[in-house]
Regions:
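Short, cationic low-complexity segments
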Residues: 172-192, 199
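Generic N-terminal initiation segments characterized by hydrophobic and/or small/turn-forming residues
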Residues: 169, 190, 307-310
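Extended polysaccharide-engagement surfaces of secreted carbohydrate-active enzymes
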Residues: 155, 159-161, 166-172, 187
């Protein structure tokens, strides 16, 4: 049987319901190392906030969805997950307004504990105490795997000892180049992205140019590290693997970090008129970055930035606050494979592709690298459906517009 395509609104509603219900069932605390790789309620809460964010965003075409209500729902979940305000089962599920089955049937289907009612309050401290920001210069190291900042992490190593080790590469939007000295995500940042890092200490751990920084040589006697001298002049270096850290093949992939959720929450707070609270929330992430410039940070010696030039975000009106939060998110998550989806949900993908086409990068070899030149608005935001799937459906599945 071939199932016809659901509408975008139906799809989002299904995902949202699934995540809300899963929060009732998943473990509230983080898993121990021997259990690592399993998702807990914190991961589901982070994903729910991200789904609600997309539903509220201008680039997601949901004409029958109240986007203001979705912003408020992001804030509601953020107050539970981040600020520790308890929430009722009814408010979590939106049961009264969205369910047609009885509570008895629903609670039995979900295998909830006996005595759980719609008025049962969920203790926020169970999840709030499980996640926090880790040190920025450690979260992408081997030692940073399964840190309190990690909400969803794909386990590539068998910590349980039952012989199921999977030696895959990372599941990122790019491919990994392996050599004896290092491993690097082979997707090149733009010079425009690099310019966003002016006076930001996170640049050292995110983007590198052809100059070889001593930070990356501290673990090797080799005076040069090959990938700095490859064709592209800029490289993402967040996932650099020092020789002492072993093979890149067993590195985990963090799907979602607590820092991203803080910035999602900050954006939502600003959208519902709480701009000062939004700035305070975004500054939790920015203040963590400032710790890279602390005198007691051993990696400060590799920085060329003065702590006096890196300041917290200031309180400002809505538009300025929104731009500042989006910029903070772009910097914090650069090189983690989220940017394309970010500009699509913001509704600015067409103008960003035009910018790339109008400002082509020139390689050190002299070759022009053109991106965005053939982008078609309203078509290329999504991929085509494989034609074989369209064919075997006998007309039930229709190809995406423009393909």
């Amino acid at each position: 049987m071939v199932v016809p395509r659901s509408t975008l609104e139906e799809t989002y509603a299904y995902i949202e319901k699934d995540l809300r219900e899963s929060i009732l069932l998943l473990r509230k605390q983080r898993y121990q190392l021997s259990e690592a790789g399993q998702i807990s309620a914190g991961g589901a809460l982070g994903l729910l906030m991200k789904v609600l964010l997309y539903e509220a965003s201008p680039g997601v075409d949901l004409p029958n969805v109240d986007k203001t209500a979705k912003w408020n729902e992001v804030v509601e979940i953020g107050k539970y997950f981040i600020e520790g305000q308890n929430i009722s089962v009814n408010d979590l599920l939106k049961f009264d307004s969205r369910y047609t089955e009885s509570w008895d049937d629903a609670s039995e289907r979900l295998f909830l504990e006996e005595g759980t009612t719609l008025e049962t309050m969920m203790n926020a401290q169970d999840v709030v105490s499980s996640h926090s920001l880790s040190k920025f210069d450690e979260i992408f190291r081997i030692s940073g795997e399964f840190s309190p900042e990690s909400l969803i992490e794909i386990n590539q190593y068998d910590y349980s000892g039952v012989g199921i080790n999977e030696e895959h590469g990372w599941l990122l939007n790019g491919y990994i180049t392996y050599d004896p000295e290092s491993s690097i995500l082979n997707v090149s940042p733009t010079s425009e992205l690099q310019s966003q890092f002016e006076n930001d200490p996170r640049e050292l751990f995110t983007i590198s140019d052809r100059s070889i920084n001593d930070y990356y040589k501290q673990d090797t006697s080799n005076p040069e590290i090959g990938w700095f001298n490859s064709g592209n002049s800029l490289k993402f270096c967040k996932f650099y693997v020092f020789p002492s850290e072993g093979s890149a093949k067993m590195r985990n992939y963090v799907v979602m970090r607590y820092a991203e959720v803080l910035l999602i929450y900050a954006e939502a707070l600003n959208e519902v008129g709480l701009s000062r609270e939004a700035v305070d929330m975004a500054n939790r992430v920015r203040n963590r970055a400032a710790e890279l410039l602390d005198d007691d940070n051993p990696n400060k010696q590799y920085q060329t930035i003065s702590a006096a030039n890196f300041k917290p975000l200031s309180y400002a009106p809505y538009n300025i606050t929104r731009d500042a939060i989006l910029k903070e998110k772009r910097i914090e998550m650069a090189g983690e494979g989220d940017r394309w989806f970010e500009i699509c949900r913001l509704g600015i993908v067409s103008e960003r592709m035009k910018y790339l086409a109008d400002n082509p990068a020139v390689e050190p070899t002299g070759q022009t690298r053109v991106r965005g030149l053939h982008f078609k608005k309203g078509v290329n935001e999504i991929f085509p459906i494989p034609q074989e799937e369209v064919f075997i459906s006998n007309g039930v599945i229709e190809q995406n517009f423009g393909y």
